[in-house]
Amino acid sequence: MKQQSTKRFLWFRHNDSFFAAPLENLQEILNQLVLRPIPGADACLAGLTTIRDIVLPIFDPSAILKADASSKKSASYTIILAVEGVPRFGILADEIGKVMEFPPATALSQSARLAFAFGGEIETKHRKFVVLAPDNFARAMELSPVSAPQDSVLNAVSAS
């Protein structure tokens, strides 16, 4: 019998949804950050913050998942993810779980934007996790390739 390959993820919760982020893309987890909202921006962009003199966009995964503009735009934690070739970005989280190994995710049967931003879903005995695909997520959120670190983030956010 062929054994399924597994991948390590950090699970987290925001609002009433559970998510899993690949451990290989996790850069750091920060406590509450001050977010500067961007008037007229997409509802999934919770705001901008500055970390060590670099401006980062912070996204609300619940707003993307549920297309809900009324989603809570604050959280106890911000998970900073790094993907080669695009600026770092953050994801809001209310609860940080633990590192777990999961088999490959099954595809989401949702809108094209959702299916692209998220890498599918994984169901365990206790809950269902929406898997974040950071490289696809960065493209879905239109984060520009890195050339000038701060300019690329600001250009991507202003294009939203």
Question: Can you name each region flagged by the protein language model?
Answer:
Residues M1-S160:
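An acidic, low-aromatic, low-complexity terminal/linker signal
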